[in-house]
Amino acid sequence: MDNESHSQETESKILEGAKVATRRRRVTRACDMCRRKKIKCDGLRPCKNCKAGKLECTYHMPSSRKSSFSPEYVENLESRVRYLETLLKKNTNFDLSSNSPSFLFFLREQKFQATNELENMSPERKVIFTSMINYGNLFVDAKHGTRYFRGGSSIHVLIQHLIRRLPGDFEICEPYSAYPLGNKNIQFDDNDPEYQFFTPTPRFSIDFMVSSVDPREIQLPGIEEALCITKAAVSYVSGIVFYTTYADFPKKIRLLYSGNYQGNFFPLFLSILCVGYYHHLLNNPSNTELQSLIKKYSFYSERLVKSADNFTIESIQCLLILSIYRYCRTEISAAWYYMKLGLNCCLRLGLHRNITEGFTEEQIDSRRRIFWAIYCYDRQLCTLFGFPLGVRDEDIDQCLPVTPKFPSVTEIEANARLFFFHGVKLYKISSRILTKLYSPNSRNVTKKHISYAVIQDLEQLLDGFYNSLPRVFRAEQPGEFQANHFFYNLQLVYYSFRMLIYRPLLHYLEADSPAMQALKVPDRQTAFTLACKCVDSAIVCVQNLSHLSKGLKRTLDRYYWTTVYCGFSTIVTLIFAALLTKNTNLLIHISVARESIEALAHECVTRRLLPLIDKMRESLMKILESNADGYKQMSPTKAPQVFESESNVPINNGPQQSIDKESNSNTQLPQVETEGQQQSVFDGNIGTIPYQAYNMNEDSFIDINTLSSMLNYHTQAVSIHHPSFYISRSDVPLEEEFQIPNELLAVDPVAESMQENSDIINEAFGLVDPDVSDGKSRESSSLNNSTPFNPTVNIDPASILEHFSQNVMKDSQNS
C-alpha cells in the first residue's frame, strides 16, 4: 500500500511540472448570423464569417432571439419571490436555502406525488388525445359590430368547424338564439307579424324606475279568466320541475283582486299570465291581441320584480318563470340573464344550504324544489353557452326533495317527481363533465389535449347513474304515455351528455387526419372507438327525439324545449360525422331528426331552422356524391384492399347473424340516391370495408368495422330501449333483445328490493363516486360461473362477444 501511494505522489509531481498543451475551448455561443446559417463561429468580434460578408457581428451582444418570457415578467416574478421569502423569514423559522433539508424534502414529495399518479395508472389510461374543440372562442356579431364569447361545450364551436368543411355560404349569426346558424342565400321575411313577435323585446333595466309603474293602472283579465289561465300556466311550467303549485294561487289571486298589491306576488302573477297566454298563442300564432297581452304582462313583470334588495321566494319563482318564457322563445341569452338573477337571489337566501331551523316542513320542501330547479336550468344553460357554472358543487349541501306529503304537492304524479329527482342527479354529473372536460384549469386536460383517464371516469359516472334508475326510466311502459314522456326526456338528456363527452374527439373518425397519425399505433383504435361512441350517442338521441316528438304532438305538450335544442345539436354532430366518414347511412338518421324538429316547430323561429337543415343536407349530399363517383371510377386492377379484423365476431347483432367469410370477399361499392331511393354506402356484410372509403392507409391498423357494426346494430335492433352499442350495463332489455343466458343476468332479490324501495331518498348532495363499488365498472365472471350477477355491475362486453361467437360456431356446426 505504501509503495502504491508513493508512486501516485511521484506521478502527480511529474505532471505538475510538465507543460501540457491546453485544449481549445469550445465556443458555446455564436453570433446571430452564424447561428442562423448554422455555421461555426470562431468566438471573436467580429467573427471571420461576418467580416467576410461585411456584416455587423452580434457576438457578445444581447441575443435577438425571442424569449418565451419578457424581462419585465421575469423581474416581476423575482420581486414576488423575494417578497414571499421576506414574509417567511419574518413569520417562520424555515431555512430557505436551496440545499436545506426541508426544501429538498418538499421537492421530493412534489415529484413523488406527480410520478406516483402516472405510475398507478394503467397504460391505456395514460393515453392523451388531441381535442378538436378549444375551451372557447370569440365570435363576431356582424349585426351589432360586437364580439362575444362561447365556450367549448357550446354548439357554436362545432358549427365553426362544420362550416369550414361544408360548402354553401353558411355563417354563424344570431348569437343570442339557440340556433346560431345562417346562410347568405336564404332570406326570410322579417316583416312577418308572427316573426316580429319573436324579435328580442326590452329586458329589465336598472335605469328604469320601479316606482314609475303603478300596479293599479295595469289592466288585468277577469278573475275567472285569470284563475283559468293561471291553472293552465302553472301546470305547464311545473309539469317537470315543480317548483311552484297551484294550490295557493286562488287565495292569493282573490286577495290581489280585492286591492292588496303588497308583496312580491303581483309580478309573479303577471309572469304566470304571460306564460299562460303564450301557451294559447302557440295554437293561434297570428293572434295579435294575444301577442299584445303577452308583451304587456312580460314587460310589467320584468320591471316590478324585486331582485336587488327586497326579494323573496316569490321573486325567485317570478325570475325563473321569466327565464323559461325566454327559453321557449329561443332567446337563451335573456333566459341566462333572468336565471342568473334568480340564482343570485337563491344564494343570498341560503337556498343552497340545508338550513331547516325556523322553517316548516312545507317551506323546507319548497326551498329544496326551487333551488334544484334553478340548479338544473343553470347547468343546461351553461352547457348551451359554455359558460362557468353559477354555483360550485363543493358549496352545496342542500338535500334533494323527498316524496312530498303535502296536499299542494301530492297532486303531482309520481313519475314527474321521479323524473325531477333523477334529473337532478343527471345534472350533477353534467357539472363534472363541464368542469373536468371543458374547464381550462382541470387536471389531465390541457388546451389541446384530453386524458383518456378523464373520459373513463365520466363514463363510469354515467353508467353508475343508469344502473341506479328505476325500471320506469329504463324501458317503455305499454299504454302509459305520460310515463313514457318522462322516460324519453330523461334518455334524451342522458345521451346528449354522453355525446358531449366524446364530441372533442370526433375528428378521429377521419383515419388520415394529422391527429390520428400523431397517435401511437396501439392507441388509434381507442381513439376511433371513442369517436364512434359520439355518433352512437347522437343516433340514440335521434331515436328518442323521434318517439318524443310524436307523443308531444298528440298531447300538445311541447314546452320542454331542451328536446329541440338537443335535436339541432345532434343534427350538426351527425352531419360533421358524415363529412368525415363519407358514409350515407348517417343521412337516414339526419332525416329522422329533421322530421322530429319539424313536428316540434310550432313557432316561426324553429320553422326557419328547417330550410337551413335542408341546405346543409343538400351540401352534404353533393360531397357524398362526388366521393362515390370518384370511388366508382377507380380501375379494377386497383381495387381497394379490404381490412378484416382479427376477430370477425358480430357485435350485439344476436347469434343468428353470423359472418360468412366467403361472402366477405365481394366488396360492395358505395351508392347514393338514385331515382328517389336512398341506398347505403355499403350494402354488403359489415365485415367488408374498403380502405379508400374512409381515406385509410393499410398501415393505420384501425378496425373500421366498428362504425359499420354500430350502424347495422341500430338498424337491426328491435327497439331503442336498450343500452347503446358501446355501453354495457345490467338492464332487463339486454336479456330480451340480445338473448344473454340467465346466469349472466341473475338478480339478487334482496338487492332488487332495496333498489326498488330507494327510488326517492332524502340524501345530501352526494355524487356517484367512481371509487364506490356500485358505480365502478367491474369485470363480470366467466360464462361457466353461476354466481348471481349484481344488477349494478356493468356487463363485460368481452364475455357477451364470446357468448355470441360460441353460438355462431354452434350454428355453423349444426348446419
Curated annotation (Swiss-Prot):
GO MF terms held by the record: DNA-binding transcription factor activity, RNA polymerase II-specific; RNA polymerase II cis-regulatory region sequence-specific DNA binding; sequence-specific DNA binding; zinc ion binding
Kindly list the residue ranges recorded as spanning the membrane. Answer: 560-580
Which SMART domains does the entry mention? Fungal_trans, GAL4
Feature: DNA-binding region: 31-57
- Give the GO terms filed under biological process for this record: DNA-templated transcription; positive regulation of transcription by RNA polymerase II
How does the record say this protein sits in the membrane? Single-pass membrane protein
Q: Which UniProt keywords apply?
A: Cytoplasm, DNA-binding, Membrane, Metal-binding, Nucleus, Transcription, Transcription regulation, Transmembrane, Transmembrane helix, Zinc
> Where found in the cell?
Cytoplasm; Nucleus membrane
Q: Per the record, GO CC terms?
A: cytosol; membrane; nuclear membrane; nucleus
User: Where is the segment annotated Disordered?
Assistant: 646-668, 769-792
Biased composition, class Polar residues, residue ranges: 780-792
Superkingdom field? Eukaryota
Q: Does the entry feature the keyword S-adenosyl-L-methionine, yes or no?
A: no
UniProt protein name: Uncharacterized transcriptional regulatory protein C530.08
Tell me the organism: Schizosaccharomyces pombe (strain 972 / ATCC 24843) (Fission yeast)
